[in-house]
Regions:
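Internal intein/HINT superfamily modules and their associated LAGLIDADG
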Residues: 1-167
Length: 167
């Protein structure tokens, strides 16, 4: 689920997944929820149906309960996947962009950086998060125009702020 402020993004994901036949086509509705501190929150959510194929995907991403980077991730890191990653876990930092990769090892983050470089000519660096053994990817400002050109068709208007003045 997402906070109500991300309504547009969640509806985009729903439409994408529903069109693939993996969830109900009924459009999710904004709901009210009371948080632990008594604050009223607006949320929106939907669920996918259960398929055996999802178990195979899960096996590629989790080994003994630990999240890992699949060896063939480069085959799946399409412009659409990159856009979703940014809308989910990206953030504008200065003139560049941060991608949250906290749960991956340093070697896995290096692998992702190499894929971004080889596949898309997107230059990036590794930033420590401040937590032990946690790292983020920082896409350099010089590569932002290249990135935006690839992902622009998929970025919902309410998420364009993550790309700064490049979009």
């Amino acid at each position: 689920y997402q906070e109500g402020s991300h309504n547009e993004y969640l509806l985009f994901l729903h439409r994408l997944i529903a069109n693939l036949g993996y969830c109900n086509t009924n459009i999710p509705k904004l709901q009210t929820r009371i948080s632990n501190n008594g604050k009223i929150r607006k949320i929106i959510k939907f669920s996918t149906w259960t398929y055996d194929q999802f178990n195979e995907i899960h096996k590629n991403w989790y080994i003994n309960g630990k999240k890992v980077l699949p060896n063939d991730i480069d085959q799946f890191l399409s412009p659409l996947a990159l856009a979703i990653w940014i809308m989910d876990d990206g953030g504008k930092i200065g003139k560049g962009l941060k991608l949250a990769t906290n749960n991956f090892t340093l070697n896995e983050v290096k692998q992702l950086i190499a894929i971004l470089d080889v596949k898309y000519n997107i230059k990036s660096t590794i930033h420590k998060t401040g937590a032990i053994d946690q790292y983020n990817i920082y896409i350099l400002s010089d590569s932002m125009p290249i990135l935006v050109k690839k992902i622009k068709p998929y970025i919902v208007p309410s998420m364009k702020y993550k790309l700064g003045n490049y979009i």
